[in-house]
Amino acid sequence: MKIFPAIDIKDKKCVRLIKGDFNNKTEYEISPVDQAGKYKDHGFKNLHIVDLDGALTGETVNLDIIKEIVHKFDLKIEVGGGVRSIDSIEKYINAGVEKVILGSAAIKNKNFLKEACQKFPNKIALGLDAKDGYLSVSGWKENSNQLTLDFLKEVNDYGASRLIYTDINRDGTKESPNFEETTNVANVSNCPVIISGGVSSIDDIKKAKGLKNIEGIIVGKAIYDGDIKLEELVKELDA
């Protein structure tokens, strides 16, 4: 199973939000580039980056930082946060990003998702962020009134190569992921699923390994707060 240490960027800093609330954030001293280097030095191969400025503006605000990370470290990087145009996808792919995550824009406009998947085969990940079974959009500030599983069934054949499922009620809480709902999503999804939101311990990683159609798991706040040591986490990587 793949493990994706997370870097969320806001105002050029590493931050973590609680339940997606921009008013409830923790800033960390280490820079995004140095944090990526730390992950690389510990032996991680994958990295999950969210441009929180981009999530608010719809622009590739932190593209230069992401480019620097790509060029300095040999990591497979997935990037999300406010990607709302083919132009933005191209910028990230040209920068060397492995997969671009489409969230709100895909939920609001299914044709955009379909076009992106056709234009960039194997490069598009679908990011579904849900609260109480319903998808949220626009930096988690709006409820889309769309049931997660209903939406997934509609777009399942569009060609996304990865699905990142986040339970907003768990994100940043370290209360463990919503394994039950993630399992429901994985059972419906045509593509492999990444678990996100609430990882608190190595036990969560071990539990995720036993689930069907789960490709990997994203770990964020538990690393920054020292609840999970990178030395322990890297042992859970597939050989």
UniProtKB/Swiss-Prot annotation:
Highest taxon listed in the record's lineage: Bacteria
Enzyme class, first EC level, given as a word: isomerase
Q: Which HAMAP family match?
A: HisA
Molecular function terms in GO for this entry?
Answer: 1-(5-phosphoribosyl)-5-[(5-phosphoribosylamino)methylideneamino]imidazole-4-carboxamide isomerase activity
**Catalytic activity of the protein:** 1-(5-phospho-beta-D-ribosyl)-5-[(5-phospho-beta-D-ribosylamino)methylideneamino]imidazole-4-carboxamide = 5-[(5-phospho-1-deoxy-D-ribulos-1-ylimino)methylamino]-1-(5-phospho-beta-D-ribosyl)imidazole-4-carboxamide
What's the name of its gene?
Answer: hisA
Main location per the UniProt record: cytoplasm
* CDD domains on file: HisA (cd04732)
Q: Which family does it belong to?
A: Belongs to the HisA/HisF family.
- Name used for this protein in its record: 1-(5-phosphoribosyl)-5-[(5-phosphoribosylamino)methylideneamino] imidazole-4-carboxamide isomerase
Record keywords? Amino-acid biosynthesis, Cytoplasm, Histidine biosynthesis, Isomerase
**Location(s) in or outside the cell:** Cytoplasm
Query: Which pathway features in its UniProt record?
Result: Amino-acid biosynthesis; L-histidine biosynthesis; L-histidine from 5-phospho-alpha-D-ribose 1-diphosphate: step 4/9
* A GO cellular component entry from the record: cytoplasm
EC no.? 5.3.1.16
What positions constitute the catalytic site? 8, 129
Instruction: Tell me which NCBIfam families the record gives.
Output: 1-(5-phosphoribosyl)-5-[(5-phosphoribosylamino)methylideneamino]imidazole-4-carboxamide isomerase
Asked if the record carries the keyword Cell membrane, the reply is no
Query: A GO term (biological process) for this protein?
Result: L-histidine biosynthetic process
